[in-house]
């Protein structure tokens, strides 16, 4: 895992703008969508979830991918690797109908056919909580050999927005 922070310095601003990129094990790896994302909120399309960027405070920043149904994706690490953590950040702001998922589930496979369940992380945020909230859903596991990571989130209501699936 490597994290790089880059800044563009503008003489007219008092503080530099910066971008934080997380180079985790799934960074820039192929993602297969078993259920498509919303055409209204595609973000960076097939690379949104593995581009290393976390979203900002708004789901319209081009880093948050929206779903109006359950989410079901498979990340191909392109080689068998040892992993111990899969996490993803979701947003909730109920005014425009954006909710946390009910839960996330993670499965792993070395061949893309036979999957092993690695766990479920249930949502702990009330669907009536009206303030803008973010939650990292996490599945920690004993070190596991995997090439394919299946990530599923269960829609609670309205939209669900996710910015990155981090694999370590």
Predicted regions and their residues:
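Extracellular recognition modules
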Residues: 5-9, 150-152
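Residue-level signal for short segments within beta-strands and strand-turn junctions
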Residues: 8-10, 90, 108-110
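Charged, amphipathic alpha-helical interaction segments
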Residues: 11-13, 114
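Disordered, acidic Ser/Thr/Pro-rich linker "stalks" and the adjacent N-terminal cap
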Residues: 13, 17-80, 91-98, 120-131, ...
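Trp- and acidic/polar-enriched beta-sheet ligand-binding modules for extracellular glycan
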Residues: 67-69, 94-168
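Short, surface-exposed acidic/glycine-rich loop or hinge patches that mediate macromolecular interfaces
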Residues: 80-82, 156
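Contiguous beta-strand segments within globular domains
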Residues: 83-87
